[in-house]
């Protein structure tokens, strides 16, 4: 038996409202949350059209090659930055005027694998063996209104399509459980002489991977308590929520305790390497995560928070490096020491849901630009007055880059 996708009714209305307007197809992303029993789809977002794109009314089958994998995967990459912990890209949808054959299904298969491959490259974490590895493709025929829902196991390159159920539900995420966490980071990434041949971005990502292990191995206090990860998150509480007062109480505060010293049973040896510079990240980040309200486990909450911490730091660094590349001056060849403020996080509600999506904002960007970005990437109209700035400017993360001559210092590293 295939997987079941429980879908917010507003997603169905959104998909039905998409007008092909002479195009041979419209593609997009399906966004939500996985669980062991079923998956939840809370949002769909069409792929933004390319500026130079000029569709005509040729027969759809002649246009299969126009399914631009690179464009769709870049959209998925941008959207993934806007998702809080626990929310991810579940798959892709495509709307066509006609029912299509096997060639088209093969194109969809390639697309869903390409999206997952792109997203996995940037993650500082990996899926566990227990997690669902199936991703969904949804094909809607606009003329017959037929829906073809199939899944593929993205861990198996030879995976074949499996049929899946697509069921709508009103108010799906209206009472989901939210988690808020403030993390103070102070990450020092030394640059050895041998690592200078790599880009600063690559060196930073390698350093973040080491920091990620601290976050993965941390102790997580939920409302000040350490809970059994296999226990029910809402153990001892009412299972049904009636009224906003009870629903509002299900926002948990999470604190992270990371290990500073090695345990006594860990043996280590010290090595000395020539240090040619360093990258330092210091400041405070605000994290949010969401879990469905269908008998969630403590481990579901902890995992969602962990991943939001890792994602938001990695995404901010990636955005900063993209900005530096765009604004690079040709005459600037040697960097001695620089300070940059990483972009701040801004949240906005999804209509009819407790879930808030996010974006990142540099100090010189306007709220209007953030509003436009939500519309372009997520096809979501938001009000500027509803934007919630997560971090104040004076508490955000500052990145300090210092690249010196190869003989200016030494790196002492502990090897376990």
Residue ranges and their predicted role:
Residues 1-88, 96-199, 203, 207, ...:
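N-terminal beta-strand/alpha-helix entry module and adjacent surface
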Residues 92:
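Active-site beta-loop-alpha substructure in enzyme catalytic cores
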Residues 155-416:
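C-terminal functional modules of predominantly eukaryotic multidomain proteins
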């Amino acid at each position: 038996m295939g997987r079941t996708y429980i879908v917010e009714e507003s997603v169905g209305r959104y998909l039905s409202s998409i007008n092909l307007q002479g195009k041979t197809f419209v593609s997009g992303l399906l966004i939500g949350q996985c669980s062991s029993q079923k998956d939840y789809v809370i949002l769909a977002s069409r792929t933004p059209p390319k500026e130079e794109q000029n569709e005509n009314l040729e027969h759809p089958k002649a246009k299969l090659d126009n399914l631009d994998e690179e464009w769709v995967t870049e959209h998925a990459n941008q959207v993934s930055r806007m998702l809080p912990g626990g929310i991810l890209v579940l798959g892709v949808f495509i709307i066509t005027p006609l029912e299509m054959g096997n060639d088209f299904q093969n194109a969809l298969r390639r697309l869903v694998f390409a999206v997952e491959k792109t997203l996995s490259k940037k993650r500082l974490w990996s899926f566990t063996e227990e997690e669902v590895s199936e991703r969904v493709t949804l094909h809607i025929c606009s003329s017959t209104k037929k829906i073809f829902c199939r899944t593929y196991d993205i861990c198996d390159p030879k995976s074949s399509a499996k049929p899946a159920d697509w069921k709508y539900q009103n108010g799906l995420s209206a009472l989901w459980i939210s988690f808020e966490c403030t993390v103070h980071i102070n990450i020092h990434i030394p640059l050895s002489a041998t690592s200078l041949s790599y880009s600063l971005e690559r060196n930073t990502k390698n350093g973040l991977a080491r920091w990620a292990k601290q976050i993965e191995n941390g102790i997580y206090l939920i409302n000040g308590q350490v809970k059994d990860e296999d226990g029910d998150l809402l153990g001892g509480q009412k299972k049904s929520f009636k009224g906003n007062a009870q629903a509002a109480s299900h926002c948990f505060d999470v604190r992270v305790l990371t290990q500073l010293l090695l345990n006594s049973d860990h043996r280590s040896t010290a090595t000395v390497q020539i240090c040619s510079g360093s990258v330092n990240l210091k400041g405070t980040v605000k994290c949010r995560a969401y879990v469905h309200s269908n008998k969630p486990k403590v481990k579901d909450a902890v995992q969602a928070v962990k991943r939001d911490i890792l994602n938001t730091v990695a995404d901010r660094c990636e955005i900063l490096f993209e900005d530096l590349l765009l604004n690079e001056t040709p005459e600037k060849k040697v960097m001695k020491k620089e300070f940059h403020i990483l972009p701040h996080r801004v949240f906005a509600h999804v209509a009819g849901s407790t879930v808030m999506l996010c974006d990142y904002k540099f100090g010189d960007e306007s709220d209007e630009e953030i509003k436009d970005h939500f519309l372009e990437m997520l096809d979501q109209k938001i009000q500027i007055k509803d934007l919630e700035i997560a971090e104040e400017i004076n508490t955000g993360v500052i990145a300090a880059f210092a690249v010196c001559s190869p003989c200016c210092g030494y790196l002492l590293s502990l090897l376990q």
